[in-house]
Amino acid sequence: LNGEFCVFDTETTGLDPGVEYLTEIGAVIVRNGEVVEEFDTFVKPGKPITSKITELTGITNEMVADAPSEAEALKAFLDFVDGRILVGHNAHSFDIRFLRAAAKRSGIEFEPTYIDTLTMAQAMYPGLHNYKQGTINKHLELPAYEAHRACEDSAALGRIFCVMLKDLEEKQVTAVSGINTGLGGNREVLKKKYY
């Protein structure tokens, strides 16, 4: 667990990756339990951002007007990732689906190995009233942050993931390959790419 991970978050124009688009990708590199690098880019979406989404994320059409295209932003993000295992909160149901849709539209191959901290938190911290990232952040007594911006969310999740790694070590899980079995149950926290 002392390797490098890329903790990331996305913001989008809506909830369905089939018809909605990325508006921001934020990420941090976690090395040996510390956040060491940051990445953030707006993305010019394939449709206007609604006032409801602007209200939620603070991202306006003006902010993304001159942003990189989806393909350019995704390439820059994948260059930053550089083959590291991805870590995201609710990644399986949301962020990975959006990245896959963007990759497909852009003709970019994208089959990552990733860890979903939502599933991980459900296994590690049973009994929380919900498993939103902010709830876990508060449960772990970490500093508050501005939610619904990819740069802030990924940095906060990086700090959360560092605590989770320490908690995993206390459970005698010392390698990424042992996360699923080490946490028990039938939850698949680590999703490996299929060859």
What do the PLM-derived regions correspond to, one by one?
Residues T119-Q122, K138, R159-C162:
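Generic alpha-helical structural context detector
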